Amino acid sequence: MHLSLTPQWSSWTVLLLLVSNLLLWENTASAMRAKRLNVHDYTTFGNTWNQAIQLSQSMNHRISELSTHFKVFYAQGRGFEKRTTRCHTSSLSSPENKEQAQKIQLEVLLGLAHSLLQAWVNPLYHLWAEMCERLGSTPPILSKALEVKTLNRNLLETIEKIAFKGNFEINENGNYTAWSELELLQSPNRDTRYFAFHNLFHCLKKDSSHVEMYLKLLKCRLIQSNC
């Protein structure tokens, strides 16, 4: 009887040992990553990353809603998509995809995300006011524009928290052309004015999408270590 039970007990023992070793390895890996990042509370650090990504996703969702609204009510049939657009952040040379971003050092990529958001502080300050004045946007649409402005500011602050907790140094890259489209947004010529809004939404959507991609990739590289 003892002999017949030995294989069963042996298999359970092996399984328990495997599970125990897996948990031990995960805890050790987390501790090693926390030590490497000089992070005392690794869980809180991860939660801050999640908060940043959620803010970025919410911001992208609102930008998409504003962009779609503008296309439907103001840009249809004007051929704006055939015109050349140029963004004031183009000189930052942002990676366009995950493969390019993987080649960038962690601190540099985090600093780039911060720089992109910082570059939009002034344009977003004017966006909702000009949408009200020049487009006659309704309060629900204006509230979304104001929400994008707030989300951008909150995301900047969250990235700064990440840098502080992770002992990163954000080197602010101000190597971008100052935004100078306000006069075009206020142009008395309707086609000029509408194209300026089209260009703004195009660039804002592109840069904001890049920020979300960078944050997800950085979290993966720092916390999951399997990208």
Swiss-Prot record:
Q: In which tissues is it expressed?
A: Expressed specifically in placenta. Expressed in both trophoblast giant cells and spongiotrophoblast cells.
Q: Which GO terms describe its cellular component?
A: extracellular region
Recorded GO MF terms: hormone activity; prolactin receptor binding
Q: Which residues are glycosylated?
A: N175
Task: List UniProt keywords, sorted A-Z.
Answer: Disulfide bond, Glycoprotein, Hormone, Secreted, Signal
Q: Which PROSITE patterns match?
A: SOMATOTROPIN_1, SOMATOTROPIN_2
Q: What is this protein called?
A: Prolactin-4A1
Its annotated compartments are: Secreted
Per the UniProt entry, the signal peptide is 1-31
Keyword Secreted belongs to the record: yes
State the organism named in the record.
Mus musculus
